[in-house]
């Protein structure tokens, strides 16, 4: 019985946090970089330079935790912000407000691999359009901490914070 429970836990961990998988279209209305350790700013800027979206949103997290606002990209509207609250929930709420204001139909979230599934779920609660993910890697030594963190944050999202 314990072996079955461990196998289910390992399978869920792999599916949700290691290989979350969410194909992306060639263009979306906005790209949102989520703040955090190892924030994949270079991935978000690369997508903007490839003109994958008309808007590039950079979450600076709490006290600029997401890093500095990058240089503007021609023909892409750059919006750097500090979410309130300074969490994935706050990022989703802010992006959801902008989506309603600008009538977006799709958004791509740029985050670290372990956070991608949860970030898409949160964004889906605040935005009625299509939500895609583009994940950046993390150092191998970060995986144990990130998986433990994501399990806790996922339970919180599913049990405590059930709405946008």
Region locations from a protein language model:
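Hydrophobic membrane-insertion alpha-helices, especially the h-region
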Residues: 1-13
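A structural signal for short, hydrophobic/glycine-enriched beta-strand patches
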Residues: 14-148
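A transmembrane-helix-recognition feature enriched in membrane-embedded lipid enzymes
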Residues: 143-163
């Amino acid at each position: 019985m314990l072996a079955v429970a461990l196998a289910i836990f390992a399978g869920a961990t792999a599916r949700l946090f290691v290989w979350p998988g969410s194909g992306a279209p060639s263009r979306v209305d906005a790209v949102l970089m989520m703040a955090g350790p190892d924030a994949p700013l270079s991935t978000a800027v690369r997508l903007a330079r490839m003109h994958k979206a008309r808007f590039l949103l950079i979450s600076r997290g709490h006290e600029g935790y997401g890093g500095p606002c990058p240089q503007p990209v021609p023909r892409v509207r750059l919006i750097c912000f500090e979410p309130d609250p300074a969490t994935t929930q706050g990022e989703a709420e802010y992006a959801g407000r902008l989506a309603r204001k600008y009538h977006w139909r799709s958004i791509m979230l740029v985050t670290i691999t372990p956070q991608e599934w949860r970030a898409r779920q949160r964004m889906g609660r605040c935005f009625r359009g299509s939500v895609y993910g583009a994940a950046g890697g993390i150092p191998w030594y970060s995986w144990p901490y990130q998986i433990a963190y994501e399990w806790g944050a996922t339970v919180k999202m599913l049990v405590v914070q059930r709405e946008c």
